[in-house]
Curated annotation (Swiss-Prot):
Name of the featured protein: Interleukin-21
PANTHER family: INTERLEUKIN-15-RELATED (PTHR14356), INTERLEUKIN-21 (PTHR14356:SF2)
Cysteine disulfide links: 71-122, 78-125
Superkingdom classification of source: Eukaryota
Functional note: Cytokine with immunoregulatory activity. May promote the transition between innate and adaptive immunity. Induces the production of IgG(1) and IgG(3) in B-cells. Implicated in the generation and maintenance of T follicular helper (Tfh) cells and the formation of germinal-centers. Together with IL6, control the early generation of Tfh cells and are critical for an effective antibody response to acute viral infection. May play a role in proliferation and maturation of natural killer (NK) cells in synergy with IL15.
Region (Disordered): 105-126
Family matches, as Gene3D superfamilies: Interleukin-15/Interleukin-21
Length: 162
């Protein structure tokens, strides 16, 4: 079996298409992984802040609970906008302020998050019940866990959100 120049070109082109296809797939899955890593980091930050709950200003904050389907990103932004503050109590103040700042950083966006920004039917932040910092953090963690679960289940069911 002799290889002609035409066959070699086809083989090279096929190999390039396969190679480029794997690169595109890998880069899109890395975006999903970045999103999941960031969401898990947010849970860790919430857990860390729960350790310092007595060093937070005991102000009541809007704390979404039982968030409607497709309103998760709206509720997430309510948690990020809340004025969680350190009570300026000594050594822990810096740790608390850095953690609060990290909570307010945006996670890598997803298609679901972009679609949700256009929804006008989600409740406003002011409509949610206000809770003390401890319960606020517990509800925030619960929402993050729900969002991770939804993201993972959408990936396993083939309707990728990222």
């Amino acid at each position: 079996m002799r290889s002609s120049p035409g066959n070699m070109e086809r083989i090279v082109i096929c190999l390039m298409v396969i190679f480029l296809g794997t690169l595109v797939h890998k880069s899109s899955s890395q975006g999903q992984d970045r999103h999941m890593i960031r969401m898990r980091q947010l849970i860790d930050i919430v857990d860390q802040l729960k350790n310092y709950v007595n060093d937070l200003v005991p102000e009541f904050l809007p704390a979404p609970e039982d968030v409607e389907t497709n309103c998760e990103w709206s509720a997430f932004s309510c948690f990020q906008k809340a004025q969680l503050k350190s009570a300026n109590t000594g050594n822990n103040e810096r740790i608390i302020n850095v953690s609060i700042k990290k909570l307010k950083r945006k996670p890598p966006s997803t298609n679901a998050g972009r679609r949700q920004k256009h929804r006008l039917t989600c409740p406003s932040c002011d409509s949610y019940e206000k809770k003390p910092p401890k319960e606020f953090l517990e509800r925030f963690k619960s929402l993050l866990q729900k969002m991770i679960h939804q993201h993972l289940s959408s990936r396993t069911h083939g309707s990728e959100d990222s």
